[in-house]
Amino acid sequence: VEWTDFERATIQDIFSKMDYETVGPATLTRTVIVYPWTLRYFAKFGNICSTAAILGNKEIAKHGTTILHGLDRGVKNMDDIKNTYAELSKLHSEKLHVDPDNFRLLSDCLTIVVAAKMGKDFTGEVQAAFQKFLSVVVNSLGRQYH
């Protein structure tokens, strides 16, 4: 993947300003509420039987934060994202059996949460760079499935 200077700077800027403890939980809770079939991967997280339960679930929130910190690896290794996520792809494919389309659903929800946080600063150009980054990560995570 070729990155422009603008794309690199934009991705690094977004993640440097991101409140992981807010954005991560908001992203994962949005994902499992909007796409309830994704809840099957989180059955061990306790009560997730209603929107209120999901919103108050500490394990969902914690995992959302973990996911964002996982994206940090991609930000730090933008020139080698495929290899950066090779082991995580294998884990999600072979052990956790996560449908790879769920990575795209999560990235869409992350885009919505980030756009809401950034407001008018989330221009079309910023969105394009952000979604390009997420697309590369999603493709890398789904690589083991092919």
Curated annotation (Swiss-Prot):
InterPro entries: Globin, Globin-like_sf, Globin/Proto, Hemoglobin_b, Hemoglobin_oxygen_transport. Heme b binds at residues 63, 92. The keyword Heme applies. One of its GO terms (biological process) is hydrogen peroxide catabolic process. Keywords: Disulfide bond, Heme, Iron, Metal-binding, Oxygen transport, Transport. Residues 2-146 form the Globin domain. It comes from the Eukaryota. GO terms for molecular function: haptoglobin binding; heme binding; metal ion binding; organic acid binding; oxygen binding; oxygen carrier activity; peroxidase activity. GO terms for cellular component: blood microparticle; haptoglobin-hemoglobin complex; hemoglobin complex. Red blood cells. Displays a strong alkaline Bohr effect, and at low pH exhibits the reduced ligand affinity and cooperativity that comprise the Root effect. Belongs to the globin family. Involved in oxygen transport from gills to the various peripheral tissues. This is Hemoglobin subunit beta. It comes from Chelidonichthys kumu. The lineage of its organism: Eukaryota, Metazoa, Chordata, Craniata, Vertebrata.
